[in-house]
Amino acid sequence: MANPQNLHPGPVFLAGPTAVGKSEVALRLAEKLGGEIISVDSMQVYRGLDIGTAKPTAAERAAVPHHLIDVVEISQPFDAAKFVMLARVAEAQIVARGRVPIFCGGTGLYFKAWLDGLGEAPAADATLRAALEAAPLETLLNELRERDPTTFETIDRQNPRRVIRAVEVIRL
């Protein structure tokens, strides 16, 4: 029988909507399990974006190491692929120290990318993107409906960024 003291739990995942207490639970778990927290929040990655992002306090960050907070400038792009890349590095470093990675946040896309991987999508094309951004949303939605009805039915049609990217992927 394995010695329970030698068992090392795998990563812990805490996901949910804003203001349900995820961060508090993550802090308690980190203290109990000897863990470190990996932020799964699309806004906490940005330096200087402190209002409205519920970043952990300096005291909380001193008590328990946090990762993927304040890692890029607000002017730099950051996406799910970059999150996965940085989260892999953070997780490997945490595990190498014999500690437990605790993924905590509310950005569902980042959790999905981490757990399910990212689909094979073409890289963005600046020229095409500019043309699509200039087009009326209704025109893009019509093209999406005709060329990819499945995506049309599932996409947030009120979100121009998602519609533009969907049409961009179709055209590339």
Provide a role label for each language-model segment.
Residues 1-172:
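Phosphate/pyrophosphate-binding catalytic cores of soluble transferases and nucleic-acid-acting enzymes
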